[in-house]
């Protein structure tokens, strides 16, 4: 069993909403490019901004032509057919220009895509034609980038391995950063196990503007019968001295003193941000890597949900602190289906 503390609405109502990407088509029946920028923290209204960018678009392959070797092959542009949709995260950089200049530079990129595999399926991106507005990101764009296929492609199985594939950028998601930085809790700290401790986890409830059932993301019904989505993130551990007895009121008082503020960003698709405005113990602060602002990209927490809702309107409708007994140290984590040294199975 777990005890729950519900955060007040003011802790997430200011920046807890993301507007949808408008899908409009032009005379050529192609989607009209659009850029969406949200603010996290208190970024400057004008001038230099720190922007985190995620490029969204369609994977395309050249269409088969029947008139091979004709003169029209040299004069007519190559036509493409869509084989999937996906994204390309290009990270944070200091940007000086306008949103429309940035959108134009992103849609002009020539992005070659290859599907491959290592320990798991991967997507390889190679980028060319980097315009001036994207020069702050050029250090990353000029190098080949490899991502987990299940995080950046909605249906990686639809990408052919024997054809040329390109990513045609249609939408740009940007997060303008202020005092809040993109600091993730390191995995070693998130997996930390301490004796005599209580795990503080956050249950985040979302309302989206699209139906997600047909895409494999089942909603849950709240008390009013509305369909909602939710996910959990780990914040840290509350530890008391040996011999001290935990109480729900003690844990709630620790959380209330933190004065947490929550917001949504567009890092990796949809991201959940936590800002600490109150007091923290040194033990808890060390678990946050000594940061007062941390980011939880949904791309890492729940990749499939992220891909289904990353272009939709998203709104935080509730955040709960869930107090659970910390997992004992002697419990073993099995990241693989094939367990080590079981029967005749041996890991190489």
Curated annotation (Swiss-Prot):
Belongs to the morbillivirus/respirovirus/rubulavirus M protein family. A large portion is phosphorylated in the cytoplasm, but not in virion. However, this phosphorylation is not essential for virus replication. The modification Phosphoserine is found at residue 70. It is found in: Virion; Host cytoplasm; Host cell membrane. Plays a crucial role in virion assembly and budding. Forms a shell at the inner face of the plasma membrane and concentrates the HN and F glycoproteins. Acts as a negative regulator for transcription and replication by sticking to the nucleocapsid. This effect might be regulated by the cytoplasmic interaction with tubulin that dissociates the M protein from the nucleocapsid. A motif (YLDL motif) lies at residues 50-53. Changing residue 279 to R: In strain: Mutant BY-5. Changing residue 211 to F: In strain: Mutant KD-51M. It is a peripheral membrane protein. Gene3D superfamilies: Viral matrix protein, C-terminal domain (2.70.20.60), Viral matrix protein, N-terminal domain (2.70.20.50). One of its GO terms (biological process) is viral budding via host ESCRT complex. Changing residue 212 to A: In strain: Mutant KD-22M and Mutant KD-51M. Its main location: virion. Homomultimer. Binds to the cytoplasmic regions of F and HN proteins. Interacts with nucleocapsid. Interacts with human alpha-tubulin and beta-tubulin. Interacts with host ANP32B. Changing residue 277 to L: In strain: Mutant BY-5. Late-budding domains (L domains) are short sequence motifs essential for viral particle budding. They recruit proteins of the host ESCRT machinery (Endosomal Sorting Complex Required for Transport) or ESCRT-associated proteins. The matrix protein contains one L domain: a YLDL motif. It comes from Sendai virus (strain Z). Changing residue 83 to S: Smaller viral particles. Keywords: Host cell membrane, Host cytoplasm, Host membrane, Host-virus interaction, Membrane, Phosphoprotein, Viral budding, Viral budding via the host ESCRT complexes, Viral matrix protein, Viral release from host cell, Virion. GO terms for cellular component: host cell cytoplasm; host cell plasma membrane; membrane; virion component. Disulfide bonds: none annotated. GO terms for molecular function: structural constituent of virion. Changing residue 197 to C: In strain: Mutant KD-22M. This is Matrix protein. Changing residue 191 to Y: In strain: Mutant KD-32M. Changing residue 158 to S: Complete loss of viral infectivity.
